[in-house]
């Protein structure tokens, strides 16, 4: 099965035309056991779940919707090296973040807080923005989960546009150790991605999904040679032409 076929199969529930950002590292292509379901994880982050807390006894592997993010963070924060790595990654995206901590309640529910440079008191997750929750979950997915093939649904959904370029850089960095597939409709992702990393997923009249790399098409190559960017072609809906 090719990478494109794997992407189509994993995203078969999606409807309509979508751009897929395939962020891959050449040295690991042959290492990915795409035929093993245990190596693949698909995430569609819902920030409402982590804000509400979770049962302390749940599994520490991050759920597809990141509902158990407090447990995943508790696991990471229990190790000094992992905690430092997490904080460095978080501060790189959110410079005002000074730390994360978890808090267990008497009813065995687990919450997490974030410390910010603006206040001495920790900020409960319930007060954090959806975008901040998403960023924390994305860092966990990219750097602390062990899946070798990761699909992430619209990770930019709650983020300010100014953060997308940095997010794409995080994806590229993390792709040294895992295959990352991002589904998106956002042209900003296309702007910061390499042309060869883009796969266009579309459906025909019968509902079948098809994948193609726009950068391989002669007409798109002509546009690119004339210094018309992939981002402009996507916004003008010319990648399928």
Where are these regions (language model features)?
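Short, well-ordered strand-loop elements centered on a beta-strand within folded domains, enriched
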Residues: 1-9, 16, 112-114, 206-215
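C-terminal lobe/lid and adjacent interdomain/linker elements of RecA-like ASCE P-loop ATPase modules
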Residues: 168-241
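Conserved ABC ATPase signature
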Residues: 88-162
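Electropositive, glycine-dotted interaction segments
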Residues: 1-92, 101
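Phosphate-binding glycine-rich loops of NTP-binding sites
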Residues: 5-6, 135-136, 186
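Short alpha-helix of the ABC ATPase nucleotide-binding domain corresponding to the H-loop/switch region
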Residues: 160-165, 195
């Amino acid at each position: 099965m090719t990478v494109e076929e794997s992407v189509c199969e994993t995203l078969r529930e999606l409807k309509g035309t979508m751009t897929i950002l395939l962020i891959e590292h050449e040295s690991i292509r042959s290492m990915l056991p795409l035929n093993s379901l245990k190596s693949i994880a698909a995430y569609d982050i819902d920030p409402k779940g982590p804000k509400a807390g979770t049962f302390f006894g749940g599994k520490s592997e991050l759920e597809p919707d990141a509902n158990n993010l407090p447990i995943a963070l508790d696991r990471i924060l229990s190790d000094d090296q992992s905690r430092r790595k997490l904080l460095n990654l978080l501060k790189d995206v959110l410079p005002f973040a000074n730390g994360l901590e978890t808090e267990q309640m008497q009813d065995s529910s687990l919450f997490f807080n974030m410390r910010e440079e603006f206040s001495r008191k920790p900020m409960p997750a319930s007060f954090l923005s959806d975008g901040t929750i998403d960023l924390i979950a994305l860092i966990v997915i990219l750097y602390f989960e062990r899946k070798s093939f990761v699909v992430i649904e619209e990770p930019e959904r709650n983020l300010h546009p100014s953060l997308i370029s940095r997010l794409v850089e995080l994806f590229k960095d993390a792709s040294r150790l895992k295959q990352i597939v991002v589904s998106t409709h956002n042209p900003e992702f296309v702007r910061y991605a390499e042309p060869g990393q883009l796969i266009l997923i579309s459906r025909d009249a019968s509902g079948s999904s098809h994948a193609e790399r726009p950068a391989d098409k002669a007409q798109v190559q002509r546009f690119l040679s004339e210094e018309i960017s992939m981002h402009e072609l996507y916004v003008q809906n010319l990648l399928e032409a």
